[in-house]
């Protein structure tokens, strides 16, 4: 069952058609604890039936002979804080600069590893930002190599005048970084976020946001799923593009972000041979659909799914409730139709469901 609403209208391509009003009180600021306490809205497309439940009963609704596909990416502690170092006086500024790590850059012209970051605060090329100001360890410095638009900067990370390699940068972020909570969570990160803003099966470090549909499962519930259904894992590293606004009034003109993905030959075979495929989250769905079209096991996924773009391999989807006018909401609309998506979101609000990353989920069958 890979169909979408066949009654495509011109309004389905209008960005404004994906807007809805969401009160701040409906945006989850903290995770459900235990994870399975999160609510679950089940929408059965064949019958039009809607059921309200929770993740304790998730397996009860998944059809037999279904393959469940999970994204095992792991979230980097991508947010770090630093102080500008005056090169003449060697004094530190009082102002704190936020550095938000994005990804490593491939460069043939640079002799040192370079990284893309976003810096809050005015900096220029050559500026040095000291990260571990209260440490007796050798100083860790981010040096600005190039200034790009939208606060983006190309930097190198240095320790004792030696440039850090990618693995060393990940180690540094793990030690000094903070959990990169999305901007709509209006609080500082805490110790609980290091645990709850990470799926229990995450392995491959590389995302700067969590695949949020995966956050609803404890180790016990994953074991229960594996005992009842076939499962497989893939990796798609979620980048900063997931938070980018769609600027085109006609969504067909939007250029979606690229994200690194990888799946094993075993997972690819399982997906290809499965009777039915249930993707846990939109990232898994995008990866599966990319593979279904191009049969590539590793690369950069830039598939954009919206009404009129049919699913070729994904039959069912588990997903959270997404931001208005977001590409994720458009992906859901590709599966159920835009008007039905808005109708389900309206119902979820009326029933007290929590939205966004730490919010509740919807199972589309």
Swiss-Prot record:
According to its UniProt record, the EC number is: 2.4.99.17
- Similarity field: Belongs to the QueA family.
Originating gene:
queA
- Catalytic activity reported: 7-aminomethyl-7-carbaguanosine(34) in tRNA + S-adenosyl-L-methionine = epoxyqueuosine(34) in tRNA + adenine + L-methionine + 2 H(+)
Gene Ontology MF: a single term: S-adenosylmethionine:tRNA ribosyltransferase-isomerase activity
Per the record's keyword annotation, is Isomerase included, yes or no? no
A cellular component term (GO) from this record?
cytoplasm
Query: Where does the record say this protein resides?
Result: Cytoplasm
Q: What is this protein called?
A: S-adenosylmethionine:tRNA ribosyltransferase-isomerase
Q: Which GO terms describe its biological process?
A: queuosine biosynthetic process; tRNA wobble guanine modification
Q: How does it assemble?
A: Monomer.
Q: Which principal EC class is assigned to this enzyme?
A: transferase
What Pfam families does the record point to? Answer: Queuosine_synth (PF02547)
Specify the domain of life of the species encoding this protein.
Bacteria
Cited InterPro entries: QueA, QueA_dom1, QueA_dom2, QueA_sf
Task: Quote the function comment for this protein.
Answer: Transfers and isomerizes the ribose moiety from AdoMet to the 7-aminomethyl group of 7-deazaguanine (preQ1-tRNA) to give epoxyqueuosine (oQ-tRNA).
Q: In which pathway does it act?
A: tRNA modification; tRNA-queuosine biosynthesis
Cystine crosslinks: none
